[in-house]
């Protein structure tokens, strides 16, 4: 067995509190209602989980429910009944959580005590706080919501919690807002002091208007009060009540709140099944304060401890290693496409404020699959590469064999494939958390990988429970500390994101304990050191990966979220910060992607662990009048017992049970209306693995794995330029520059550069000016032409005639006049940018000559030859023929490996250089002399300004990159090959003379 680089840690155990063997079987829904109405434990579970459904059932029992609502009631109650016995995922009073450990021998008995961890329902609490912020605003202190940011003359919030219909809100950035915002930026300020600050500027006669404006900021959460401090993390009943008591002179809230606290304490000591009346009492008291769908949240905590043995630990670590290695096959994701857009717009030498970056107009918007909010422009789906063609063939071959032989798909044979894959490609995973169900097959205990598999966000599963007991606090801290230590070694500051979701109904899953150095809060605040949203800048590091920096402290940050909220529901900015911090390639499992379109997938196993149970898709179109549901599932050879699955939600069904078949039929009908499918999954015996009081329980575990092999000390003490303001960097049309986007298909761009660009260059030269161009795609291919001369309007009139001719000849389809956003940071500042632009202009004069040379049938020059040798000449000019300096540069920027064998090409290029044929045709061209002069001017300027060597290299790299863009187009892989070949070429020239 290959040694794992992941070490399994103590794990979370989640199990049902009811024994599945005690579950009754029913043939009619009336039997269900009759039974559950006598089951005090289930009734209390239901009253907590869904108070409205509990009330509807009471109406039915009293004969007061309308007939059309009865069927829905029956089905809902039946599903909850099944859940109470058969699902172990944490939810209310249905299941409990404990900590398990690895030891010499396994032990599956739960012998500890179960306690209730009770919190106020977060939606109820937040709504109450918002109400009190209005009622007691004059007695409270306020701070600025960190979700606010200024953009132009408006103040936006990254999302809103006031309306599920809106993705963002904004108000005008006024002098009054500026005064209040700056006053409340770093701490809580009393209401009276805020008003006083405004009236000091405008006079007492504006007091009433100031209070009205301040009230609107509070209602719309531009300001948040001290009541919100630590609501989502480290919440304390006593601290909260002390704050309320200080402002509630009429005792409107404090008396009932203290009564609620007392009732909750009493309820926490009552056995489950005996607490219905006390629970109703709590609901009654809380509803009089504020009505809501739910009132309290409960997680059951057990001090039991089960054990897995050494062999099981090794088996799980083996699985973690295999799953971790699958990330090596991921070559391109949506974030890689986003990175390319970032580099094209900003280069790699500047940091961009995250709020500007995500703006669809002034930035580049959000990555393709981000939806909160959606980009307000259309874009086609970017290409991705999650696995190789070789992998695809392996998986398909295994699938065919398994289906043909009615066998499982065994992934053991792929282990060596992933182990060998790109040995120099290091995985960036700091660790994993895997979700596993416990089951039994052929009298043997087995693990089944959960439907949501897991994640690489260590602490994500334990954060919600971390404040419920000292043991769980310590457990969570141990997991988080492993990440903290690694980040500290890399000089990275960790930051926990704490936020209210857009829909505060989901806020119950947002609880966590803060165990990191800093916090990024949205729509809430904490007692910890906080990072301001507006101080977060995004850049590209030396490995071409995204990073985030706090511009006020220069710290490189990584962001984590250890609540259980679905990341696809995060606002775009938060999701991005979270995903780039995790380098989130884990979870793109090749078998899921390759098999996802199949209607049947056999069981997948690895080292006797079930990676994925057998699955069947049932489409609505599969059902017809000639075949019953039972006949349909029999025709697909679906077993007698199975699950109907939706994400991590699954319901056990049996073909023998008529009520189960009704649930299945109802689900198929619903999917038919959506023109969708339902997924069925094979059933495993899971009822008697873990025992409590001599009775079995359904259970699952969450096992964290911490990487044991250090990823190395990769400190990030690099410096990037802060992006210059829009006002200084952007040139409006006909203001110094004229910027044209000429939309031309890729296959006709060279024709335009050969036949039309020289004429445009003559027009500009006659007006004492110059121009340069770039090739681009966003998303349509075009040539970007930037022109500078004494009379841009006159030049435009003449250029327009040439463009008309190119359009008449069907070369150019259309063109735009745009704003020139100068890449000031990329080229070291305004002075060196101007000198770089001179290089671009000289280079743009050479390109038509190079294309002519390539096109000329009288020689055998190929585009690869010309691109290599002109790059060679560029390097010779920049480094004044010093090969050692050239090699130092190439060692930094060149890739370490390419697929092509370049040995023969090196010999070919060396011969070409000796013949010097290329030099005769290009090197002595007057335009090349102009280019050499421009390069020399830039080089001397960089020396005069004492640029760091890293900065010099970066500017040279950028200049060569845009030259290659002009000559060969957007070919990043080819550019890597060019650099690699040049490195080999200069090594040969220097050391093999």
UniProtKB/Swiss-Prot annotation:
Matches recorded under Pfam families: Lant_dehydr_C (PF14028), Lant_dehydr_N (PF04738)
Family: To B.subtilis SpaB and S.epidermidis EpiB.
Location(s), subcellular: Cell membrane
Regions that span the bilayer: 838-851
Protein name: Nisin biosynthesis protein NisB
Gene it is expressed from: nisB
Cited InterPro entries: Lant_deHydtase_N, Thiopep_bacteriocin_synth_dom
Main location: membrane
Species lineage: Bacteria, Bacillati, Bacillota, Bacilli, Lactobacillales
Membrane topology reported for the UniProt record: Single-pass membrane protein
Taxonomy, superkingdom: Bacteria
GO cellular component terms, semicolon-separated: plasma membrane
Function noted in UniProt: Involved in the post-translational modification of the lantibiotic nisin.
Keywords in alphabetical order: Cell membrane, Membrane, Transmembrane, Transmembrane helix, Transport
């Amino acid at each position: 067995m290959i040694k794992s680089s992941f070490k399994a840690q103590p794990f979370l155990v989640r199990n049902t509190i009811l024994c599945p063997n005690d579950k009754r079987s029913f043939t009619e829904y009336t039997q269900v209602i009759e039974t559950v109405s006598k089951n005090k434990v289930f009734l209390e579970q239901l009253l907590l989980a869904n108070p409205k459904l509990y009330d509807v059932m009471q109406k039915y029992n009293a004969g007061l429910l309308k007939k059309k609502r009865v069927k829905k009631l029956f089905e809902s109650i039946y599903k909850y009944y099944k859940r109470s016995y058969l699902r172990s995922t944490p939810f209310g009073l249905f299941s409990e959580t404990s900590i398990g450990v690895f030891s010499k021998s396994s032990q599956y008995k739960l012998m500890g005590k179960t306690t209730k961890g009770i919190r106020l329902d977060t939606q109820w609490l937040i709504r109450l706080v918002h109400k009190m912020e209005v009622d007691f605003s004059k007695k409270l202190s306020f701070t600025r919501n960190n979700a606010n940011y200024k953009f132009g003359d408006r103040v936006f919030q990254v999302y809103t919690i006031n309306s599920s219909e809106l993705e963002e809100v904004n108000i005008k950035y006024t002098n009054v807002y500026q005064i209040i915002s700056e006053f409340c930026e770093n701490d809580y300020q009393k209401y009276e002091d805020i008003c006083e600050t405004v009236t000091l500027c405008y006079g007492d006669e504006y007091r009433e208007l100031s209070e009205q404006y301040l009230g609107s900021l509070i209602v719309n959460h531009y300001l948040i009060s001290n009541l919100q401090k630590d609501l989502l993390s480290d919440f304390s009943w006593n601290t909260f009540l002390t704050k309320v008591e200080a402002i509630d002179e009429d005792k409107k809230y404090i008396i009932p709140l203290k009564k609620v606290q007392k009732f909750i304490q009493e309820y926490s000591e009552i056995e489950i099944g005996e607490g219905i009346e006390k629970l109703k009492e709590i609901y009654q008291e809380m509803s009089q304060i504020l009505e809501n769908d739910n009132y309290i949240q409960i997680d059951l905590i057990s001090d039991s401890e089960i054990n897995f043995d050494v062999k099981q630990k090794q088996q799980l670590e083996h699985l973690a290693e295999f799953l971790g290695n699958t990330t090596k096959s991921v070559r391109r994701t949506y974030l890689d496409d986003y990175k390319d857009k970032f580099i094209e717009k900003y280069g790699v030498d500047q940091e961009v404020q995250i709020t500007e970056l995500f703006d669809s107009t002034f930035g580049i918007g959000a990555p393709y699959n981000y939806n909160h909010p959606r980009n307000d422009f259309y874009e086609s789906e970017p290409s991705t590469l999650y696995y190789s063609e070789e992998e695809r063939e392996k998986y398909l071959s295994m699938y065919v064999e398994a289906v043909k032989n009615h066998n499982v798909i065994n992934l053991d044979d792929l282990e060596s494939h992933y182990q060998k894959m790109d040995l120099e490609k290091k995985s960036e995973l700091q660790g994993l958390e895997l979700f596993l169900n416990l089951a039994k097959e052929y009298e043997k205990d087995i693990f089944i990988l959960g439907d949501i598999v897991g994640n690489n966000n260590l602490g994500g599963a334990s954060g919600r429970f971390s404040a419920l007991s000292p043991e769980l606090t310590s457990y969570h801290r141990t997991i988080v500390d492993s990440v903290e230590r690694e980040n500290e070694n890399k000089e990275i500051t960790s930051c926990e994101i704490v936020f209210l979701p857009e829909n505060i109904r989901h806020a119950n899953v947002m609880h966590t304990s803060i165990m990191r150095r800093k916090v990024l809060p949205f729509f809430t605040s904490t007692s910890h050191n906080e990072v301001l949203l507006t101080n977060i800048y995004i850049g590209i590091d030396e490995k071409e990966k995204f990073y985030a920096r706090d511009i006020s402290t220069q710290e490189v940050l990584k962001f984590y979220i250890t609540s259980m909220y679905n990341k696809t529901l995060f606002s775009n900015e938060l999701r991005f910060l979270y995903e780039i911090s995790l380098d989130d390639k884990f979870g793109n499992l090749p078998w899921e992607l390759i098999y996802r379109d199949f209607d049947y997938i056999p069981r997948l196993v690895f080292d006797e662990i079930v990676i994925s149970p057998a699955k069947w898709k049932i489409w609505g179109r599969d059902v017809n009048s000639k075949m019953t549901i039972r006949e349909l599932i029999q025709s697909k050879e679906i077993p007698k017992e199975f699950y109907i699955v939706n994400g991590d939600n699954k319901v056990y069904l049996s073909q023998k049970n008529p009520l189960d078949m009704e649930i299945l039929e109802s689900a198929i009908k619903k999917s038919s209306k959506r023109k969708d499918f339902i997924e069925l999954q094979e059933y495993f015996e899971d009822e008697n693995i873990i025992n409590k009081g001599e009775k079995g329980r359904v259970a699952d575990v969450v096992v964290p794995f911490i990487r044991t092999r250090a990823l190395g000390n990769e400190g990030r003490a690099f410096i990037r330029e802060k992006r210059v303001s829009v006002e200084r960097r952007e040139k409006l049309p006909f203001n110094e520059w004229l910027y044209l986007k000429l939309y031309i298909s890729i296959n006709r761009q060279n024709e335009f550069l050969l036949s039309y660009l020289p004429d445009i260059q003559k027009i500009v030269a006659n007006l004492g000016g110059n121009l340069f161009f770039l090739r681009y795609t966003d998303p349509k291919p075009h040539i970007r032409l930037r022109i500078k001369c004494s009379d841009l309007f006159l030049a435009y009139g003449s250029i327009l005639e040439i463009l008309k001719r190119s359009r008449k000849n069907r070369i150019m389809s259309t063109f735009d006049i745009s704003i020139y956003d100068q890449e000031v940071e990329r080229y070291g500042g305004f002075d060196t940018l101007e000198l770089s632009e001179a290089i671009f202009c000289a280079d743009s004069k050479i390109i038509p000559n190079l294309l002519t040379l390539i096109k000329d049938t009288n020689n055998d020059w190929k585009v690869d030859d010309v691109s290599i040798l002109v790059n060679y000449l560029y390097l010779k000019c920049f480094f004044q023929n010093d090969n050692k300096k050239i090699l130092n540069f190439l060692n930094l920027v060149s890739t370490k490996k390419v697929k092509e064998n370049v040995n023969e090409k090196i010999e070919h290029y060396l011969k070409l250089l000796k013949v010097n044929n290329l030099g005769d045709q290009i090197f002595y061209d007057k335009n090349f002399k102009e280019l050499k002069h421009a390069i020399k001017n830039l080089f001397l300027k960089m020396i005069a300004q004492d640029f760091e060597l890293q900065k010099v290299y970066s500017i040279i790299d950028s200049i060569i990159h845009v030259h290659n863009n002009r000559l060969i187009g957007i070919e990043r892989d080819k550019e890597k090959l060019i650099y690699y070949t040049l490195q080999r070429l200069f090594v040969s020239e220097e050391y093999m003379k």
